[in-house]
Amino acid sequence: MTFRHCVAVDLGASSGRVMLARYDSKHRTLTLREIHRFVNCLQKTDGFDTWDIDSLEKDIRLGLKKVCNEGILIDSIGIDTWGVDYVLLDKQGQRVGLPVSYRDNRTTGIMPQALVQIGKSEIYRRSGIQFLPFNTIYQLRALTKQQPELTAQVAHALLMPDYFSYRLTGEMNWEYTNATTTQLVNINTDDWDDTLLAWTGAKKSWFGRPSHPGNVIGDWICPQGNRIPVVAVASHDTASAVIASPLANKHSAYLSSGTWSLMGFESKMPYTTDEALAANITNEGGAEGRYRVLKNIMGLWLLQRVLKERRITDLPALIAQTEALPACRFLINPNDDRFINPDDMRAEIQAVCRETDQPVPVSDAELARCIFDSLALLYADILHELANLRGEKFTQLHIVGGGCQNSLLNQLCADACGIRVIAGPVEASTLGNIGIQLMTLDELNNVDDFRQVVSANYDLTTYIPNPDSEIARHVAQFQPKRQTKELCA
């Protein structure tokens, strides 16, 4: 067969999309077409911040039906989403409780309990995962302690992409790359860790053994009656994004830039040393047995909240205004935990600047300048941490995802990091999703083969660092800004 048609369902923390890929195996050309795009946002339900997963499922099915109604024969479907969140089911497959978001405050104070009762080094030795207060391990502990009446009803716990695959196929799966984000998978066995799981109060019977990407979960029956395989892709969206990052060599780092920024490098071995623990490095699972050694950064969430609060719809115009402002007048630590989900992001940023005796950003452009400069400096700081960890400097940084369209931030990043930045592809999570599907269909050999296809089919933009830029002069001064209570601590 010359052509393959694969559908990627890519759900982010702020939006979702159903994308159709067409792959010409003879000429190795790959094109994407957006079929359906929809909003994903938090809603308050019974006092909890929750996801509207019924609406998301409706939009997923609508997008798939649109493809089928065009008369296109779909070869496979894959689903990727954000990490750590889950859905509980009873024996009949019906939901138990609410699909609570990681941004909900129910996990406040839970992580410190684990550090005392199990020990920080012991948790890290077992999982190799970064300490984030909303990791699934702490969410499950919050659930079993705060809502114990629900636990007796639970038969299964599915992470978000596995839940939507289940809704399409009726078959359950626990995909490995996303499972590792829970901080509950043992880094040595690739299976659920008995000690960590027992601490949460959840039962091991709720989970099946994690499976590596590339297996067929089951079939979705389209309106025309065709059975279409649903593939377990690298279902954590960052894992998919990294697959589509055209990394040139082992000296290339990546930055998946969106609501979250995830900066790291690929490795065939995990880093679980005392130094890695002190730097709060995470070793998330990747495709083909690779590890994604990285750090989570709050990312463009701060900007997204400001845009929403200020009702700003013309982002390019705002960026143009921002570029005209002087650099580094207002600096914050974007990973300060006070930015996780404040009532008013603008007011929170202003408060930090006021408390640290800086000028206070007032205009929308000043707020954006504060966010962009601070992110670029944080990127530089973390890249330096990662280089020290592996004992070798990086020569270039690949920025992928929606954030790579921000040329101002890309240049600031190059200047602050002092290395060449390669921006693109934009739809990295979608492409990585498609890549695993094509490998499962035996159209491609491996991840490296797929990256060659990405490089040949998608435009990449290079940014050269300017050592004389204003932001480059502030890199050494930024470290004190990070001495706050970080999200990733």
From Swiss-Prot:
Cofactors (names): Mg(2+)
Is Transferase tagged as a keyword? yes
Q: According to its UniProt record, which reaction does this protein catalyse?
A: L-rhamnulose + ATP = L-rhamnulose 1-phosphate + ADP + H(+)
Q: Where does substrate bind?
A: G83, H236, D237, T238, N296
Family in the record = Belongs to the rhamnulokinase family.
GO cellular component: a single term: cytosol
What are the UniProt keywords, alphabetically?
ATP-binding, Disulfide bond, Kinase, Magnesium, Nucleotide-binding, Rhamnose metabolism, Transferase
What is the official name of this protein in its record? Rhamnulokinase
Question: What Gene Ontology terms for biological process does this UniProt record contain?
Answer: glycerol metabolic process; rhamnose catabolic process
For this protein, the record's Gene3D superfamilies field holds: 3.30.420.40
Query: Which CDD domains does this entry report, sorted A to Z?
Result: ASKHA_NBD_FGGY_RhaB-like
NCBIfam families (alphabetical): PRK10640.1 (NF007925), rhamnulo_kin (TIGR02627)
Q: In which pathway does it act?
A: Carbohydrate degradation; L-rhamnose degradation; glycerone phosphate from L-rhamnose: step 2/3
